Every structure is written in C-alpha cells, then in structure tokens.
C-alpha cells in the first residue's frame, strides 16, 4: 500500500516545477489533484509565489487584502504592465506600484497586464503620492492613449476610456463630464493612501467603485463588449499609484 504522504510529496515536487498554465490543466485531471491544488497556501503555491514575486512585495502591507500565496501570485500577474504605460512612467521593483517621473506639461497613464471581457473583477487602487490637479482611475481599451501634452484628464478623454477624477469627483468619458460621483451631498474628497476598490462587471457591462468598504454606486453603464484594462492617468511629478487585483468581488 502506498503511503498517502509519499503521494503528497511526489505531487508537491512535480507541481512545483510546472508552469502556471499546466497547473490549471492538472487541477482538471481528477478530484484528488483538484483538492490538492485548491489549497491556496500549500507549498506548491508558496513555491511559485516566492519564485515570481519580488521579496519586498510578498509580506508588504500593500498585499494585505490578498492573504494566500495563490492570490498574491494572481495579483502580481495582473499588476501594472511595464510595457503598456507612458514613457514617463515606470513600474517599481515591487511590481505593483507605478512611478510618474517629473516631466513638465505631460499627462501620463498606465494599464494593467491583463484585460477583461467576461466575468466580474475587482481590484484596489492606492494613490500613494500627491494627486495634483487631475488624478483619474478607471478602465480603458488598448486603443486609449497613454500620454498627451499638458495637464488634463487623459483617462476619459476619448470613447475608449472611462474614469473617475478623484480631484473634482467627476466621471469622465469621451471627453465629457458625465456628472458628479459619488452622488452624495458634500461627498468627501479622496485622501492619499485610501484604498479604492474598482468593480468591473463584464456580464452587466457596468463599472462601480467602493471606498472604505462603502459601495459608492454604479459609475458607468453600457460598457462595450471589448477587453477592458485597469487604468490610471496622473500629472503630478514623482507621484506613485499601486494596484492590487482581488479577483471576483464578494456581494454584500
């Protein structure tokens, strides 16, 4: 009779050296392998997490909302793309935070590595430096511009992007202000360091936001059937913005 512990150790050793796409296929082979890989804090996920994530990120307070090795790894794979941002922006070594260089008369944006066309998705955005005159968070397609001259609300300036300007509490799309947001009397302004949760529902074609665990309402409806990416645009020199992908949002 084979010792179950022996089987466990063998699987652990094999799965630790597979690529992530292969792990997904393995989880569909049988119930035993599914349950094995369903443990998000197992040594397999720990191994993959520590191998891919920068050391400074794994135990950072930035990832306090993603508590397992698997969800930390997933957040990293969805973080800002160093290849899909303005030339005046770079992604810091932690992999989750972008830094805007102090370039005069420029507005600069960045997109996440992975876009969404189906399902429901949530991520947190944390503005960790001054907002400046314009600071916009939201979504865009691949066609939306990532840099322009002047200090403007770049995200939301065309029909390929949708944004919330945190400075003025305005919604922006197609170059127009779509109204105030949230719809509250004397709505409080964003404070640097607050976590804003962005909720994209590709099934219902809506974009919503939460702040301090309070749902602020639906911001945009009728989103197109296109792949949409987490996006921000900034104007302030040396400001920094972090993004942490959370997965499917919890209702209630």
From Swiss-Prot:
Pathway: Protein modification; protein ubiquitination. Residues 58-250 form the B30.2/SPRY domain. Gene3D superfamilies: 1.20.1280.50, 2.60.120.920. GO terms for cellular component: cell cortex; neuromuscular junction; nucleus; pole plasm; SCF ubiquitin ligase complex. Disulfide bonds: none annotated. Coiled coil: none annotated. PROSITE patterns: B302_SPRY (PS50188). Its main location: other. SUPFAM superfamilies: Concanavalin A-like lectins/glucanases, F-box domain. Keywords: Neurogenesis, Synapse, Ubl conjugation pathway. It is found in: Synapse. GO terms for biological process: negative regulation of gene expression; negative regulation of synaptic assembly at neuromuscular junction; neuromuscular synaptic transmission; positive regulation of protein catabolic process; proteasome-mediated ubiquitin-dependent protein catabolic process; protein ubiquitination; synapse assembly involved in innervation. InterPro entries: B30.2/SPRY, B30.2/SPRY_sf, ConA-like_dom_sf, F-box-like_dom_sf, F-box_dom, FBXO45-Fsn/SPSB_families, SPRY_dom, SPRY_FBXO45. Pfam families: F-box-like (PF12937), SPRY (PF00622). Residues 1-48 form the F-box domain. Required in the presynaptic motoneuron to down-regulate the levels of wnd and restrain synaptic terminal growth at the neuromuscular junction (NMJ). Component of an E3 ubiquitin ligase complex composed of hiw and Fsn. Belongs to the FBXO45/Fsn family. This is F-box/SPRY domain-containing protein 1. The gene is Fsn.
